[in-house]
Amino acid sequence: MSNKLVLVLNCGSSSLKFAVIDAQTGDDQISGLAECFGLEDSRIKWKINGEKQEAALGAFTAHREAVEFIVNKILAGQPELAAQIQAVGHRIVHGGEKFTRSVIIDDSVIKGIEDCASLAPLHNPAHLIGIRAAMASFPKLPQVAVFDTAFHQSMPDRAYVYALPYKLYREHGIRRYGMHGTSHLFVSREAAKMLNKPLAETNVICAHLGNGASVTAVKGGKSVDTSMGLTPLEGLVMGTRCGDIDPSIIYHLVHQLGYTLEEVNNLMNKQSGLLGISELTNDCRGIEEGYADGHKGATLALEIFCYRLAKYIASYTVPLGRLDAVVFTGGIGENSDLIREKVLNLLEIFNFHVDSERNKAARFGKKGIITQDNSTVAMVIPTNEEWVIAEDSIKLINKE
């Protein structure tokens, strides 16, 4: 029987991640990254059956040319595999309130994604370019949109409405939306399996920690609160994003220090977070190296990162009422035993006790419980957003 394969596309502003995923197993048959769009050294790297390959895309390549390369060069060299692709699944960062679940893409869906572009100006326009490129290259395959925000549409209004004049929400949609929903969905499901509990009876707090980072309270398989807001800027300290700050800082920077609003936006999104505090790097590995060497900026950045994360985790016990586990995922969450241990030590009041050997073992793609047997459970689960996108794509096309 042929496999149920899906080509998954994740279009950034100047890059395109892609994978051919088996929707039944989550295994990637092909995976790769095209990057540096718009520059002379645009390149594409991919892996088939563990074999890594790389090629130049040519000067000033963009999404359409990258998709054409995937079709005409990579997939053309794997005709049996290409023939099993049943759909193209697209990761879409922001679906606003228009999209509460994954959908098959048609003209109305494209219009809806366009309408949400103001909420994700760096991401949604790039997703639309990727969708149109995929439609041109795969005119006979169904295209599916999977939204990062959809999982969080189950939040109650007390969690997503800001304490601003209500008409700003009613008339302009200004509210908390949250991100990383596909990742939080996947790891919360996997956590229930590891706990040997029905998903509907499982309460977990998921920490997706990468250059972007967010925490979500998941009650019975549904998001009930999350740290990112209208945009990905709110919440935790991140690689280059400031997370939560006093909003009046913006007024102070503009009116007292002479910043423009564009400069403030750039400062808070690209110059803050771990990079801004440490004055060293946004890469957590570099921060940990600096911490080990006694670098004051790196040490402070690490301490603030862990402290803010622990406070969020503690606060999310409120909407859950009962906590079954804390789940770490994402590049930092999956690989930094140091950060996991620091965060859980700050949460000792909740009876977290780290098992050092288990914690060190749960790295580099290995999942596992990292706490002692008599402790509240904390675990590491590598995320697999592409698998969720592939699963949703197959489910949707089978309903048609």
UniProtKB/Swiss-Prot annotation:
Annotated EC: 2.7.2.1
PANTHER family named in the record: ACETATE KINASE
PROSITE patterns: ACETATE_KINASE_1, ACETATE_KINASE_2
InterPro entries: Ac/propionate_kinase, Aliphatic_acid_kin_short-chain, Aliphatic_acid_kinase_CS, ATPase_NBD
Location in the cell: Cytoplasm
Protein name: Acetate kinase
Enzyme class: transferase
Cofactor names: Mg(2+); Mn(2+)
Binding site for Mg(2+): 10, 385
Main localization, broad class: cytoplasm
Organism (species): Shewanella sp. (strain W3-18-1)
Residues that hold ATP according to the record: 17, 208-212, 283-285, 331-335
